[in-house]
């Protein structure tokens, strides 16, 4: 679903919810959770704001949460406090008897939207002409169901930031080259970690429909889709240099959605799960600058007062689309559910379900 479809289908929050106090909203949500019991499963992504995160029955990254939903067979209603592609993945992995709901349909992902299926299919045709049948498509799970389905149809798979290295290794056993969607930075950082030189990577620009490289085509092994996370691109080498000068004893850990320059200048890089576990296990008194979403950084700081934890970018703000899920929309979604209304149900189109699930399963079987 692109941003225009979202705006057309999204329903406006009734004014009454903005007039309610935080206490009133929290109490109503608790009442719904108590009444529905195990029929309701509320999932909270790590980047959610605390006012919503507090109500989650399970927390984690996008794939973890989708897998949890699939295992919770008693849950008829799954309220996904995350963004659209995450709810789609949950819908793919759960049964037809389970309904996945997104409290605010405007909670999308700009990076996922950067890989439009029509642009991707045109790019694939062009790349096949350029390279022949030598390319395997891989997509980050932070992508639409349509892109996952595209990869499934063409022998490819999904990857997460945790298993990207393992999946790229697998991809190169299948084909000579790979197309990595939609985040160029995760693709570049992972390929570089595997020992592939930057010169062997090219960027496909979907706007100009051109391959951006100054190298001979036969030297290209990785084709990176020109997409990025608007949050993680805001971390720069200048932020790192400033900390090195002013806080030399502070460790810097970043997410691999950051640019390559940031990743190689940081002390460590890894998935959201890796960042959380690294800081949790760190010695008391250690100092950390974290290059990832602000809600998570603040939560880590609050949960570990014995350590100094700050954002790598001091002017960072939370992910705007993730922040669309607020306590008012959550309460409204549950009120509607109590009346038998499925507000903003997320359902992957039938034509995409099989191949998208195949792309996910290829990953789950190997990583």
UniProtKB/Swiss-Prot annotation:
Listed pathway(s): Cofactor biosynthesis; NAD(+) biosynthesis; quinolinate from iminoaspartate: step 1/1
> Can you state which reaction this protein catalyses?
iminosuccinate + dihydroxyacetone phosphate = quinolinate + phosphate + 2 H2O + H(+)
Coarsely, its chief localization is cytoplasm
Coiled-coil stretches noted in the UniProt entry, renumbered to this chain: none
Give the cofactor note.
Answer: Binds 1 [4Fe-4S] cluster per subunit.
* A Gene Ontology BP annotation from the UniProt entry: 'de novo' NAD biosynthetic process from L-aspartate
What are its cofactors? [4Fe-4S] cluster
Q: Record-annotated residues binding iminosuccinate?
A: 45, 62, 140-142, 161, 255-257, 272
Q: Which SUPFAM superfamilies match?
A: NadA-like (SSF142754)
Record's keyword terms, sorted: 4Fe-4S, Cytoplasm, Iron, Iron-sulfur, Metal-binding, Pyridine nucleotide biosynthesis, Transferase
E.C. number, please?
2.5.1.72
Q: Does the keyword Aminoacyl-tRNA synthetase apply?
A: no
What's the domain of life for this entry? Bacteria
Enzyme class of the recorded protein, top EC level: transferase
User: One Pfam family name from the record?
Assistant: NadA
Q: What does this protein do?
A: Catalyzes the condensation of iminoaspartate with dihydroxyacetone phosphate to form quinolinate.
Which PANTHER family does the record associate with it?
QUINOLINATE SYNTHASE, CHLOROPLASTIC, QUINOLINATE SYNTHETASE A
This chain's protein is named Quinolinate synthase
Task: Give the source species.
Answer: Halalkalibacterium halodurans (strain ATCC BAA-125 / DSM 18197 / FERM 7344 / JCM 9153 / C-125) (Bacillus halodurans)
